[in-house]
Amino acid sequence: MFGCLVAGRLVQAAPQQVAEDKFVFDLPDYENINHVVVFMLGTVPFPEGMGGSVYFCYPDQSGMAVWQLLGFVTNEKPSAIFKISGLKSGKGSQHPFGAMNLPQTPTVAQIGISVELLENLVQQTPVANAAVSSVDSFTEFTQKMLDNFYNFASSFAVTQAQMTPNPSEAFIPANVVLKWYENFQRRLTQNPLFWKT
């Protein structure tokens, strides 16, 4: 029913079923994992009105299981990518795996999937930073570079009355830089690869 994928590793397509409606994947050497993909295999859909909440579990310093809600998968949204690299020091959250005695090993984390009503899934709040940004890193870099350039150039802005004439320096009006900045942002939003044309 479910699969789990970590970059550079084989796909796991056989979770351990720990209850009728709960499944667990082991993630060995979890300290070196940044992202996890959880997906439905397409062989068995969720029953009508049901979906699966996805949890990340890791052992804390004392070896106790810490569970954190990452998000969910449904028949309409059969896969999701979760960032887990920043979650290994966070606090746990309420979870449906509490009564189960799942073995914990210091270097093995787990992804848990709990089949639940869709109306319950949408009311749950995933841990912050688990969702992967939908903006690619190039677009994010370009946006930050634009902001940095505009802020840097604007920090030198002076009024015409404050200017001291210097024949060896060229001055660019701040409104020209602002217009360029706004145009570049607009074009980047419309097509992040516009600069290649």
UniProtKB/Swiss-Prot annotation:
It comes from Gallus gallus. The keyword Nucleus applies. GO terms for cellular component: cytosol; nuclear speck; nucleus. This is Protein Hikeshi. It is found in: Cytoplasm, Cytosol; Nucleus. Its main location: cytoplasm. Belongs to the OPI10 family. GO terms for molecular function: Hsp70 protein binding; nuclear import signal receptor activity. Keywords: Cytoplasm, Nucleus, Protein transport, Transport. One of its GO terms (biological process) is protein transport. The keyword Nucleotide-binding does not apply. The lineage of its organism: Eukaryota, Metazoa, Chordata, Craniata, Vertebrata. Acts as a specific nuclear import carrier for HSP70 proteins following heat-shock stress: acts by mediating the nucleoporin-dependent translocation of ATP-bound HSP70 proteins into the nucleus. HSP70 proteins import is required to protect cells from heat shock damages. InterPro entries: Hikeshi-like_C (IPR048364), Hikeshi-like_N (IPR008493), OPI10 (IPR031318). PANTHER family: HIKESHI FAMILY MEMBER (PTHR12925), PROTEIN HIKESHI (PTHR12925:SF0).
